[in-house]
Amino acid sequence: MLGILLYCRPGFENDCANELQDKATALEVFGFVKTKRNSGYVFYQCYDPQQVEYLLEKLDYKQLIFARQLIAVKAFINDLPLDDRISPILEITRNLPLGGDLYVETPEGDDTKPLLTFCRKFTVPLRQALRKHNSLTAKENRNKIFYHLCFLDNKSAYIGFSVPHNRSEFYMGIPRLRSPSEAPSRSTLKLDEAIQVFLTAEEQQERLHSGMRAVDLGACPGGWTYQLVRRGLFVTAIDNGAMAQSLMDTGQVTHYTVDGFKYEPERKNIDWLVCDMIEKPKRVAKLMGQWLIDGWCKEAIFNFKLPMKKRYQEASEDIKILTDMFEKEDLQYELQAKQLYHDREEITLHVRLIGNHWGKQLGNG
């Protein structure tokens, strides 16, 4: 084994690398980073090859903010013969455990986008060859490792694997979503992606369903509200701006022209709080934390707008504000933070209080 490969948003390689380096150092797995600006990936080569699988086991994909995918790299080939790329790959994968599927990919970098067509065409013959050599299951099996072949050019590629329950299930780590024509803004895709990334299909059925109540802070014109309405929730939209009339016509939306930082709900039994306000992240962190601590909501999805520099440092500080608030109140919580595909200079968080109680108002709503 060589090291760990992460995909990330182009331009955020340093943030992704700093995060990975911090976590590897904390685990006493030492190595060095290989990447370049706008490449869309980070490779961490371990000094001790025996520690790669240990690092993979200890890293939690859900807790990596800037990573789109988490891959353990078996080998790097930079001289694949153009007339027979498959044979060298089969030689490497025969020493890997049985795989459940294959992703032939390329990072979302400026230099590699032209390779996507080749990757798709190469997938079928390589998958057939792997199955013929009993390296892949006859049908896709998501409980097995997935093989990843990450091309940097037409003859150079990382070869490795991801493990079940500790990876993105999406090709290239990117969910393919279509912007609904009736949505008031393209920001709707951010919440749609967040829901799919943070909650399983079963969790969505249990905790995000018709009849529930939500509050959308900074709702105008309604991109995030739309995602809640289409799932059958009743939404209180908070914004000094105007909401799309199409949403108001559903009868599921109540709009108040109030500052999101000053609004207090009359009913304290809100299932979901969502927030995409353009505001300093530390201020948003304190607001979200207080809503949860006071029992005004059960779960929240919200964004932190990041600065142009030291984004990993800023994100870490903002998340610590939240965790410190919860720990001071002795509250148990689940927290995930991800830079989603549809995020720009921002990250999206999901927070849920758990245990026998949530917030101060349980039973009083």
Swiss-Prot record:
Signal peptide: none
Primary localization: cytoplasm
Enzyme's top EC category: transferase
UniProt cross-references to InterPro entries, sorted A to Z: RlmM_FDX, RlmM_THUMP-like, RNA_MeTrfase_FtsJ_dom, rRNA_MeTrfase_M, SAM-dependent_MTases_sf
GO terms, biological process: methylation; rRNA processing
UniProt keyword annotations, A-Z: Cytoplasm, Methyltransferase, rRNA processing, S-adenosyl-L-methionine, Transferase
Coiled-coil region(s): none
GO cellular component: cytoplasm
Residues annotated as catalytic: 305 (proton acceptor)
Highest taxon of source: Bacteria
Family under the similarity heading: Belongs to the class I-like SAM-binding methyltransferase superfamily. RNA methyltransferase RlmE family. RlmM subfamily.
PANTHER family documented for this protein: RIBOSOMAL RNA LARGE SUBUNIT METHYLTRANSFERASE M, RIBOSOMAL RNA METHYLTRANSFERASE FTSJ DOMAIN-CONTAINING PROTEIN
Subunit structure: Monomer.
Protein name as catalogued: Ribosomal RNA large subunit methyltransferase M
Gene of this entry: rlmM
